[in-house]
Amino acid sequence: MIGLVATIIEQTTTAVKVSKANKQLEKKAYVDLHTGLPNKSKCEELFHTVEFIKSPTACIVFDMNNLKHVNDSLGHSMGDQLILNFARLLRNSVPAKDFVGRYGGDEFIAVIYDASRESIAAILTDLQKETEKFNNYGTHIKVSYSHGWALSTDYNECTLRTLFDKADKYMY
């Protein structure tokens, strides 16, 4: 009986360790370790999980300006800090119910659910105000970005991937 209890305890302990290891692996696979935001793999997974968008949804693509210049002139640690600052500003400006991710080096996306032109404008206005406050606070590296957006109600049978591609195109 004691041997059986010891075996059960050992198997339970092993199962808990495996579960924790799996969660850590999933986090590494889907979370940008620098910003804590979902990474490109998670963004791509989101694109594939939504076949056709049924409710008004928007995708906003953001591209940080001058990151290469900051990296080249002030060093990559300052560039990393700039990325982290923008990620925080963006996450704080987009409602918690919506998705924010880091798509690549200096590119971020926001997926806004139950979106309208007004809600998109409100998010972008809030982000601009927060960015101006941050830049006026006295930091020597300024946050600057470009953005483009697309709203599902403007297209028939639209996928999230289609919205992303259109928003990315509208950025330029």
Features from the language model and the residues they span:
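Conserved long alpha-helical elements within nucleotide-processing catalytic cores of c-di-GMP signaling
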Residues: 26, 30, 39-58, 65-95, ...
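Inter-domain helical "communication" segments and dimerization helices
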Residues: 3, 17-20, 26, 116-122, ...
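Residue-level signal for beta-strand positions within conserved beta-sheet cores that form or flank
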Residues: 55, 96, 139-143
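Signal-transducing coiled-coil linker helices
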Residues: 2-33, 41-51
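PAS-family sensory domains and close relatives that share small-molecule sensor folds
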Residues: 114, 149-151
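Catalytic core regions of nucleotide second-messenger enzymes
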Residues: 102, 131-148
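A structural signal for short, well-ordered beta-strand segments
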Residues: 59, 108, 145-149
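S-adenosyl-L-methionine-dependent methyltransferase catalytic core, i.e., the SAM/SAH-binding region
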Residues: 156
